[in-house]
Amino acid sequence: MDQLNGKEQQEFQKIVEQKQMKDFMRLYSNLVERCFSDCVNDFTSAKLTSKEQNCIMRCSEKFLKHSERVGQRFQEQNAAMNQTMGR
């Protein structure tokens, strides 16, 4: 990144931010689709039942914890690869 001039760094940063937003939106969309499909079964009311609300809360927490764990493992593997390449 040090090889880039100011304008190139700004453009690079913009690309990174766009990718992060796209990744976040994909994560959010997957979360909504998964938890809605698994938890919402009663379409006779516009409101969620308490059972559906609890299911969605558990599903969301589990999904986010899993995503966080996968991200941590990816970072660990990436760091290990960088160490191996640096030798």
Curated annotation (Swiss-Prot):
Which keywords are on file for this protein?
A: Chaperone, Disulfide bond, Membrane, Metal-binding, Mitochondrion, Mitochondrion inner membrane, Protein transport, Translocation, Transport, Zinc
Record GO terms (molecular function): metal ion binding
List localization entries: Mitochondrion inner membrane
Disulfide bonds listed in the record: C35-C59, C39-C55
Topology relative to the membrane, per the entry? Peripheral membrane protein
One record GO biological process? protein transport
Q: Which GO terms describe its cellular component?
A: mitochondrial inner membrane
Q: What InterPro entries does the record point to? A: Mito_inner_translocase_sub, Tim10-like, Tim10-like_dom_sf
Spell out the family assignment given in the record's similarity comment: Belongs to the small Tim family.
Subunit structure, as described in the record: Heterohexamer; composed of 3 copies of TIM9 and 3 copies of TIM10, named soluble 70 kDa complex. Associates with the TIM22 complex, whose core is composed of TIM22 and TIM54. Interacts with the transmembrane regions of multi-pass transmembrane proteins in transit.
Function recorded in the entry: Mitochondrial intermembrane chaperone that participates in the import and insertion of multi-pass transmembrane proteins into the mitochondrial inner membrane. Also required for the transfer of beta-barrel precursors from the TOM complex to the sorting and assembly machinery (SAM complex) of the outer membrane. Acts as a chaperone-like protein that protects the hydrophobic precursors from aggregation and guide them through the mitochondrial intermembrane space.
Name of the protein in question: Mitochondrial import inner membrane translocase subunit TIM9
**Upper classification of the organism:** Eukaryota, Fungi, Dikarya, Ascomycota, Saccharomycotina
